[in-house]
Amino acid sequence: MKKQFLEKAVFTVAATAATVVLGNKMADADTYTLQEGDSFFSVAQRYHMDAYELASMNGKDITSLILPGQTLTVNGSAAPDNQAAAPTDTTQATTETNDANANTYPVGQCTWGVKAVATWAGDWWGNGGDWASSASAQGYTVGNTPAVGSIMCWTDGGYGHVAYVTAVGEDGKVQVLESNYKDQQWVDNYRGWFDPNNSGTPGSVSYIYPN
């Protein structure tokens, strides 16, 4: 099945002040083969790493698409299978991203997550359920066909939800980056491939396309 992928989304992250000694890190480097459901955040948590550093070590950024079977270079010790990995400090990273993009939405919310990736999104579009109408009022095209780089909106008459489309399959299934999915308040690909019209997220689905 042919699929359309977004190889790299524009995602600005504030530069860290610390100097990383790559030589020492590569000397201790190991590899990890990605499993179904893995993400930069889950692998980084497993190896007590920072997700943004992990992506950079592998020549990618945090929004790059990774798939089961691919190998990532890692460092650090993996947590035992019967022991939960120590949480990484994602709060600092997401806060820096918010500052870098002048993100006007509450940190951790779905609107914040999409604005962090799709910086062209409006600053004051309201809750996720308001985004389609707000974008249309500002001259953006809103439609019913998924497209890589578009913003997916679930409008349910309440808060709604939004996500950023990174891949579209010929069967209509999509992959997205989103925040606040099942209360997980950082940007990630939580669902893999899914049918946007049968996703378990309530509301009618529409898409905002960048101008």
Swiss-Prot record:
Q: Can you name one GO molecular function term for this protein?
A: hydrolase activity
Q: Name the residue ranges with Low complexity bias.
A: 78-101
The Peptidase C51 domain extends over 85-209
Which segments carry the region annotation Disordered? 77-101
The protein's enzyme class: hydrolase
The LysM domain covers which part of the protein? 30-74
Write down the EC number.
3.-.-.-
- Presence of keyword Hydrolase: yes
Q: What is this protein called?
A: Putative hydrolase SMU_367
**Lineage per the UniProt record:** Bacteria, Bacillati, Bacillota, Bacilli, Lactobacillales
